[in-house]
């Protein structure tokens, strides 16, 4: 999961410097998907200790993972206009302090998940932390243009974390939610990479628009969007959802596809940015439709 950040003044209060290292908007979307997973896992209300403990624990571990991401990409972020303002890139927060901050957040998150949810949720969330901060950020991102595909599982895990928090297990329904986010991630991220490709050229990271060009990236966005639309029908086919979700999935999928086709036919950075932003709205509305369908049908 990713979101675009606008430029923020270099002089920030100390608390805000640490706050932005957690990438709060990305964390918010991840926690939202985890909460959806919690509610879909039960026909009734999620127990309040599990709900609020899960939110807090997942938020803290996600924030720790993003802070480690900022630490690992400190030199890369300094080269990119989109990320050069980050306190890690400017040196306003030192690597030592980022490590301590991440350890504190991660430890608190693990303790909360163990005590308010269950050990399975804690271990799954910790594995997601390692998958994102180490496997994706450190190993895959600088090595292959397919980094977002291969490493996408860690970003797709939040619904499964929420599901596990409630049920202390993972079922096929939980993995369907993971599949949707996994397939959604490439077109979402590559739209960003297209209109920020100059940044990625500067960074030296082998992102698809840099290594394979605009047209190849657009073709991949189109193909993954078609796969995504098919994947979003699976909850209905499997019997996990009803007609409200089905109609929503079709309408939202066609809207997303319209953006992608327009981008494929006549590319512009402005349209790529709109497509990227709509992809976030798309996922939020899709999961909201699942939740409404779950409780009202």
Swiss-Prot record:
Residue spans crossing the bilayer: 26-46, 48-68, 96-116, 120-140, 147-167, 174-194, 218-238, 243-263, 276-296
GO biological process: heme O biosynthetic process
Keyword Membrane applies: yes
Record InterPro entries: Protohaem_IX_farnesylTrfase (IPR006369), UbiA_prenyltransferase (IPR000537), UbiA_sf (IPR044878)
Pfam families, alphabetized: UbiA
CDD domains linked: PT_UbiA_Cox10 (cd13957)
Enzyme class: transferase
Topology in membrane: Multi-pass membrane protein
Enzyme Commission no: 2.5.1.141
Catalytic activity: heme b + (2E,6E)-farnesyl diphosphate + H2O = Fe(II)-heme o + diphosphate
Keywords: Cell membrane, Heme biosynthesis, Membrane, Transferase, Transmembrane, Transmembrane helix
Pathway assigned to this chain's UniProt record: Porphyrin-containing compound metabolism; heme O biosynthesis; heme O from protoheme: step 1/1
Subcellular location(s) per record: Cell membrane
Domain of life: Bacteria
Cellular component annotations (GO), alphabetically ordered: plasma membrane
GO MF term set: protoheme IX farnesyltransferase activity
Family per similarity comment: Belongs to the UbiA prenyltransferase family. Protoheme IX farnesyltransferase subfamily.
Extra information: Carbon 2 of the heme B porphyrin ring is defined according to the Fischer nomenclature.
HAMAP family listed in its UniProt record: CyoE_CtaB (MF_00154)
Protein's job: Converts heme B (protoheme IX) to heme O by substitution of the vinyl group on carbon 2 of heme B porphyrin ring with a hydroxyethyl farnesyl side group.
Name of the featured protein: Protoheme IX farnesyltransferase
Taxonomic source organism: Polynucleobacter asymbioticus (strain DSM 18221 / CIP 109841 / QLW-P1DMWA-1) (Polynucleobacter necessarius subsp. asymbioticus)
């Amino acid at each position: 999961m990713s979101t675009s950040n606008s430029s923020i003044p270099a002089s920030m209060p100390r608390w805000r410097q640490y706050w932005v290292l957690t990438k709060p908007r990305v964390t918010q979307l991840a926690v939202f998907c985890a909460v959806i997973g919690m509610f879909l896992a039960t026909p009734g209300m999620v127990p309040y200790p599990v709900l609020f403990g899960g939110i807090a624990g997942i938020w803290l571990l996600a924030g720790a993972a993003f802070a480690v991401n900022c630490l690992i990409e400190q030199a890369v972020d300094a080269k990119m206009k989109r990320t050069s303002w980050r306190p890690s890139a400017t040196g306003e927060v030192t690597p030592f302090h980022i490590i301590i901050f991440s350890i504190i957040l991660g430890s608190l998150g693990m303790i909360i998940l163990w005590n308010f949810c269950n050990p399975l949720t804690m271990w799954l969330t910790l594995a997601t932390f390692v998958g994102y901060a180490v496997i994706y950020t450190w190993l895959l991102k600088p090595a292959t243009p397919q980094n977002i595909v291969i490493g996408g599982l860690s970003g797709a895990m939040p619904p499964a974390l929420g599901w596990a928090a409630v049920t202390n297990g993972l079922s096929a329904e939980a993995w369907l939610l993971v599949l949707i986010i996994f397939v959604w991630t490439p077109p979402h991220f590559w739209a960003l990479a297209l209109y920020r490709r100059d940044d990625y050229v500067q960074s030296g990271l082998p992102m698809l628009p840099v290594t394979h060009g605009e047209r190849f990236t657009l073709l991949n966005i189109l193909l993954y969007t078609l796969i995504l639309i098919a994947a979003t029908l699976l909850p209905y086919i499997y019997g996990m959802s009803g007609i409200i979700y089905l109609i929503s999935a079709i309408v939202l999928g066609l809207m997303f596809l319209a953006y992608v086709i327009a981008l494929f036919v006549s590319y512009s950075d402005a349209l790529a940015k709109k497509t990227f932003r709509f992809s976030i709205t798309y996922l939020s509305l899709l999961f909201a439709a699942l939740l409404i369908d779950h409780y009202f049908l």
